[in-house]
């Protein structure tokens, strides 16, 4: 099973970030934090040579549901999405919740992981170009 689900998009980096936010909102998810990795590295005089932004996203009801079953799931929350450039192409992607949850022994929540994964993948697919 692959860890990452991603697609290229025809949108600019900035447009893709805004569109991800819109798509997530339409699916009852919110962006808790937007981390500009390129900017952070530049503060340390390190040039990444491309734009890379991590979005931490969450649906409070889903988070409560999984945390109530096993607090250790908190290591994987909030869900991560990324918008980045590589070789002149913008990509949008996410880490698959089903893969992450499969890493905790005894954790049995495939339905919840599948629901969240479907939403995140639909968000990525909405930007595919």
Please give the residue ranges for each predicted region.
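Terminal, regulation- and interaction-focused segments at domain boundaries
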Residues: 1-28
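Short glycine-/small-residue-rich flexible loop motifs, especially phosphate/cofactor-binding loops
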Residues: 21, 38, 121
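Active-site rim loops that border cofactor/substrate pockets in soluble metabolic enzymes
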Residues: 29-30, 40
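General beta-strand structural signal in soluble alpha/beta enzymes
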Residues: 32-34
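Compact, glycine-rich, soluble single-domain proteins
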Residues: 36-82
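Beta-strand/loop substructures that line and gate deep hydrophobic ligand-binding cavities in soluble
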Residues: 80-106
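Well-ordered alpha/beta subsegment
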Residues: 103-129
